Amino acid sequence: MANFSNDADLMKWEPTLFRDLAVPGQRLAAGVDGATSGITFTSASASFVDAGVAPGHVLRIEDSGGDAFGCYEVLSVESATELLATQVGRTAADSVDLPAGTGWVYFLDTFDPQAEEVRFELLSRLGLAVDDDGEDLQDLVLQPRTLRRASVFGTLLMVFEGQSGAAEEGRNLAAKAALYRRLYDKELAKLRVRLDRDADGFADDVRSPGSIRLQRG
């Protein structure tokens, strides 16, 4: 099942997240042979499909000297060696070209594991975590986008909380974690999620995630 938010959603709140706090163990792809033209990014050495790169992931590029040129939202994966990307929040219809060039150093990191934990947490709060067959009941959520902000805040909470102990700037990261804890709890308190139990496109039930705090495993 898809998470309720993606990496590009996180960047709308934390533009430097993938530059500052990328987790090496969660790196999908990287290389030194990136090339750009329009919104097309290619890497002859890549295997984007096998790496699991998907729309909503974030492409970070640098020049050979290590100077950052930005982070961009993946729009689509065209082949094993080619993807389309543009400024975060834009679509193919209103896309902005990538900086043109060759020999780009690039990284595709993800916080999908954290977003997946938050997805399960939100479903648990809604009583949808597991059915009799051992499957979750996310399909019952009529409008999954209503959970996007909660997913973003919960994911950022886990990212900052998880890295606050090890980093030199741990105090600042802990403060960020506390901020997203407040935003997460506030979002949960006002959320009302409509459920469609008979797949007719209409709500049969409305639930609130409640006020239980997100706990790290």
Describe the residue ranges of each PLM region:
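Short linear motifs in intrinsically disordered/low-complexity regions
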Residues: 34, 51, 95, 110-113, ...
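Autoprocessing Asn-cyclization modules and mimics
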Residues: 3-94
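Surface-exposed interaction regions enriched in Ser/Thr/Asp/Glu
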Residues: 54-55, 91-116, 120, 124
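Short loop/turn elements at secondary-structure junctions
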Residues: 1-28, 157-217
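Internal mixed-charge
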Residues: 108-195
